[in-house]
Amino acid sequence: MELLKNNKRIFPLIGAIIVFILSFSVLYMGDNIGLSDNGDFRRVLLVNNMEYENDSNYYYLFKQDYKMKVEGAGFWDKITYLCESNSEEDIYSSPQFIIIKASKVMNFVANKITSRDETTYNIAYLAFIYILMLSTAAWGIFTFFADEPRKMQIAVFLIFIFIFCDAGYLLYFNSLYGEPLQYVSLMILIALGLLIYKRPTIPKIACFFVALYFFAGSKLANVPYSVIVSVLALSFAYLRKGRLYRIGVLICVILAAVCITNLYMSIPSW
């Protein structure tokens, strides 16, 4: 007990683990739950070389399983193909596709281990990544409050659990919509912003702008706001002295602005 009281790293870690377990339980303890397809999934599926499990689209019904195209002579050739986009359908780009491709690789490896059809895609692996990202954000937020009195830490933990782990948010994790990436990347931005304010370092600032890029690309309507945030983030340069540090902040801001602007330029006419 004394160790728990004195070690400031324990409670953020325990809190993040609880967030992970609770979020996973909400989605997969009992009947699997998620959001139905309103017709938007097809566009995402085509770009990522995926398709519905059968000929019936089942719009407005939640679907757990899909099919992914797998091509290649060997294991690594297939992994490489899973990370590629459909050039014929690549009409827009989004960092959401990075998360989807990662979940495809996880599905493929799991299918190999369990001797299942290698083309089977279970959306639970996508939800797993989102839950992991949310838990990481929780860890960052809890770490920021690690120096506060225990009552404050418990209050922050309970607020996070009852507000940000609500089933209404978590349901989106079992879908191909952009909202779950928007949600978890925003939470990571908040966590990193707090940690940067407390102890500014270039790695944290670089991660902040990576999260901002994911937030911008999760919903293209976020792009203009993200450009503004990237410019305002120049204020990070005043949180710590040092020429190299400030140059690093400036480089991060410029790179983020360029990448986010490129996202804006890629917005299709529709």
Residue ranges and their predicted role:
Residues 1-31, 96-270:
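Hydrophobic transmembrane helix bundles of membrane-integrated enzymes that assemble
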Residues 25-108:
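Extracytoplasmic loop-helix module adjacent to an early transmembrane segment
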